């Protein structure tokens, strides 16, 4: 079995660097069966997911990861990843806290996001 913690770290670094620089480039990480739950809105499919991410009402964003936990799922090499962290949006000085969960599915050694759940954490 591959080192799932290293996989989770590499994936999240790539995902957030891409998200922060050009969200439209995230399409290669999703498939038609992929699902995104974003602040209660549920979307399915690459096109719908990327359209949602691109339409978010900010120009600049910076993700700062606070915690990252991963576990293997099943026998196919898939991995579930839970991330908590902070977002800095546009010119805001106060970071917003968030939680995000990814279910990464192994497809012949290449991984894609089957499930993506995102929530801002208030309070």
From Swiss-Prot:
Superkingdom of origin organism: Eukaryota
SUPFAM superfamilies: NTF2-like (SSF54427)
Annotated GO biological process: protein import into nucleus
All copies of domain NTF2, residue ranges: 7-120
InterPro entries: NTF2, NTF2-like_dom_sf, NTF2_dom, Nuclear_transport_factor_2_euk
Main localization of the protein described in the UniProt heading: cytoplasm
Record keywords: Cytoplasm, Protein transport, Transport
Leader sequence segment: none
Pfam family, one: NTF2
Gene Ontology molecular function, alphabetical: nuclear import signal receptor activity; small GTPase binding
Subcellular location: Cytoplasm
GO cellular component labels: cytosol; nuclear envelope; nuclear membrane; nuclear pore central transport channel; nucleus
Function: Facilitates protein transport into the nucleus. Could be part of a multicomponent system of cytosolic factors that assemble at the pore complex during nuclear import.
Official protein name in the record: Nuclear transport factor 2
Organism the protein comes from: Schizosaccharomyces pombe (strain 972 / ATCC 24843)
